[in-house]
Amino acid sequence: MAVLPLLLCLLPLAPASSPSQPATPSPCPRRCRCQTQSLPLSVLCPGAGLLFVPPSLDRRAAELRLADNFIAAVRRRDLANMTGLLHLSLSRNTIRHVAAGAFADLRALRALHLDGNRLTSLGEGQLRGLVNLRHLILSNNQLAALAAGALDDCAETLEDLDLSYNNLEQLPWEALGRLGNVNTLGLDHNLLASVPAGAFSRLHKLARLDMTSNRLTTIPPDPLFSRLPLLARPRGSPASALVLAFGGNPLHCNCELVWLRRLAREDDLEACASPPALGGRYFWAVGEEEFVCEPPVVTHRSPPLAVPAGRPAALRCRAVGDPEPRVRWVSPQGRLVGNSSRARAFPNGTLELLVTEPGDGGIFTCIAANAAGEATAAVELTVGPPPPPQLANSTSCDPPRDGDPDALTPPSAASASAAAKAADTGPPTDRGVQVTEHGATAALVQWPDQRPIPGIRMYQIQYNSSADDILVYRMIPADSHSFLLSDLASGRTYDLCVLAVYEDGATGLTATRPVGCARFSTEPALRPCGAPHAPFLGGTMIIALGGVIVASVLVFIFVLLMRYKVHGGQPPGKAKAPAPVSSVCLQTNGSLGPTPAPPAPEPAAPRAHTVVQLDCEPWRPSHEPTGP
């Protein structure tokens, strides 16, 4: 019976501990407003001066707004266990770092706003777990890199992706191509210089694509653009229309953009940046016939090259055209040469063979191609045995040449034959363009009058040397048919082309027509065997004169030291004077007569100790009187 009262006392406590009752809501963070009375729960902390995500968040919240604060990082534990969160706003903070897996528990999240922060990169693990994300806003950050797998978890659900106002030079285009449900893609105000062909071909639901203010010079045709009509303004456009914005890019208006010019547009502000004839003109006002390309022209290629087996070899090929041609190489066996363990192909047209073998010899073909055509050139490579060793101390000099070494003189027979051989394998040379005289640093170019071409405004000379890729231009008046090229480098091969710039009577536009090309070589700088140059003599004379002066000073110092020692350590002219004598003690035998001469010395004998008495008196000279 004693148990019954105890049970009656415990009955009021039972409902409080029942699992069916809802848990006590967490306290609302300081400076925040919380909506917990009705579903969905929300925590609103905009502009609250927060330095980090509040730890006392209600984990049941469906909406969390932390915009306009000073949050610098999102840690793994900040948003843990918030499985019901649908909307998260972290806009306009100072976020620099997002921990890997920071959003891993937000599997129900649909909208994530990270715009207006300081993110510099987005890795593969930072957005992990967002399997239901539809809106991702990353604009106004400092993003310079986007990992290829950063959007893998939300690739099938993402509908809105905003990457505008960042520092992106490259994008994972393959990953973007997997966003099959994306409706809006914002790539404007970045540093994108190119878009690969077919990058948007699988974005079937794309309705708006913004690529405004990038560095795009061309936009490749895409199947998506050909299927849907293009309208510049979304207002009044049909449901299936694609809104494409690409203004503010330095468009190069050539034949590669004809497909875009043919599409129907309402209005936009795109303009051409190049070529110079179309620069600054409204894109949609340029006629289709003005979108032209120029076929490639090979301006430089390596002369016949001979290397010993086992040594590296570099084959060079340069070409110009509009658009810039792409250079490829074909081996003597007819195979396309690419990057491998023995060869490297560079975008500038250089093919480097790291280690040559006897089987590498033959004719290599350089193929330069662009949208307007292609051009080829052959380069001969000979692989032979190593050359005989040369003496390291051997010296040689070239015989002097009459006159100035840089004067224009006809080439020698050897150089003429070498130039003729190079011309046979070089680019086609027009007989109308001739380099009649060339020395070590100058060459005279001549071409005939181009009467068949009406309305010539000027001539243009293009040339470059075998040692660099810089193409030099010279504009010549229309009434001139020769030009002296100066400031050339000695011992180099130059490829030169002359073009006529004229006004096309049919279209009224400026056009160019090649007059011809030529190849020539400047003579090497000679080392004369005569007397050394004046600067050399002047330096030698200065050194010799300085040596003479130094030697004279040393001799003078030596003489002074010797004289100083001879005079007993006193300067010359100041010899030591004899000390004054006050008295002299003389030994006498009782008389003051003249002192007899001393006897001859006798052999020394032992002396006994004797006492000698001295009579001393003041000394007087003999010529003075002794009395008054």
From Swiss-Prot:
Transmembrane segments: 541-561
Gene Ontology biological-process annotations: cell adhesion
PTM summary: N-glycosylated.
Residues annotated as domain Ig-like: 295-382
Disulfide bonds listed in the record: 317-366
Amino acid composition bias (Pro residues), ranges on this chain: 595-604
Matches recorded under PROSITE patterns: FN3, IG_LIKE
Signal peptide, first to last residue: 1-16
Stretches assigned to the Extracellular side: 17-540
InterPro entries found in the cross-reference section: Cys-rich_flank_reg_C, FN3_dom, FN3_sf, Ig-like_dom, Ig-like_dom_sf, Ig-like_fold, Ig_I-set, Ig_sub
Subcellular location per the Swiss-Prot or TrEMBL entry: Cell membrane; Cell projection, Axon; Cell projection, Dendrite; Synapse
LRR repeat segments: 84-105, 108-129, 132-153, 157-178, 181-202, 205-226
LRRNT domain segment(s): 19-59
LRRCT domain segment(s): 249-295
All residue ranges annotated as the Fibronectin type-III domain in the record: 427-525
Record topology, Cytoplasmic segments: 562-628
Keyword presence, Zinc: no
Residue stretches of biased makeup (Basic and acidic residues): 617-628
Predominant location category: membrane
Similarity annotation: Belongs to the LRFN family.
Entry domain remark: Lacks a cytoplasmic PDZ-binding domain, which has been implicated in function of related Lrfn proteins.
Function of the protein: Cell adhesion molecule that mediates homophilic cell-cell adhesion in a Ca(2+)-independent manner. Promotes neurite outgrowth in hippocampal neurons.
Protein name listed in UniProt: Leucine-rich repeat and fibronectin type-III domain-containing protein 3
Lineage start: Eukaryota, Metazoa, Chordata, Craniata, Vertebrata
Gene assigned in the entry: LRFN3
